[in-house]
Amino acid sequence: MAFKRISRHGIGNLTNRRGGADHRAGQDNGDGPGVSVNTGDRQETGRPRLHCTVVLVGMMGCGKSAIGRTLAARLGVAFVDSDAEIETAANATIPEIFARDGEAFFRAREAEVIARLLRGEPCVLSTGGGAFLADRNRQAIAEHGVAIWLDADLDLLWDRVRHKDTRPLLRTPDPKMTLARLLEDRAPIYAQAELRARAEPGLSIDAMTERVIAILADRPDILEIPDDS
């Protein structure tokens, strides 16, 4: 199957470089650090500055896409979903790719897309549930970005995915048991992510985004928040 190369506006061919800030990040005032505005190749002075791509990893249903969009808007950077990139390039949905070409084909394309996006400008990147399992993806993320695991328990994940038929790996006679086994197998690998944010029932998208920002703000080499923001 032909798989065309595509690019997204705002994610060019610049190489990510993690900034070497030597001062502490400012404190959150309760409303978060504000929204940064992109002006060409860099963010406005006095606003939060993202030094590398933030890669959201975790199980299906943990909130990567929803949190990713909100986080990107707050930081004034692009949001990219690796699954959506693959679907656009392949002109097919993820379930269709799995059924037609197999998981191995999908994983290879996934690795290509993630590597390309990591070479672009700092952004927020949401990845598929299996992406972080591949050693080559973990290595690429460690070199060019930072991974943050959105850690959710089985009941929360099941509540979010049980009514959806867009998860190829859950098309089994007992999808909840399948989900439980996937979580058990994958959690030790997700735990290798550099950062971790615990997802909890009842926590809104905005509240979860605040939690992620607070974690990132503890690392000024990743996210700088000026004292006056």
Model regions: which residues?
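P-loop (Walker A) phosphate-binding loop of NTP-binding proteins
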Residues: M59
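Hydrophobic positions on the alpha1 helix immediately C-terminal to the Walker A/P-loop
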Residues: I67
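A glycine- and Lys/Arg-enriched "phosphate-lid" helix/loop adjacent to the NTP-binding pocket
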Residues: E143-P188
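Hydrophobic anchor at the beta1->P-loop junction of P-loop NTPases
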Residues: L56
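Conserved lysine of the Walker
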Residues: K64
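Short glycine-rich anion-binding loops that position phosphate/pyrophosphate groups of nucleotides
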Residues: G129-A131, D153-D155, G202-L203
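ATP-dependent small-molecule kinase phosphotransfer cores
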Residues: D81-A142, T166-R167
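NTP-dependent small-molecule kinase module
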Residues: A2-R18, H23-R24, P33-R49, T70, ...
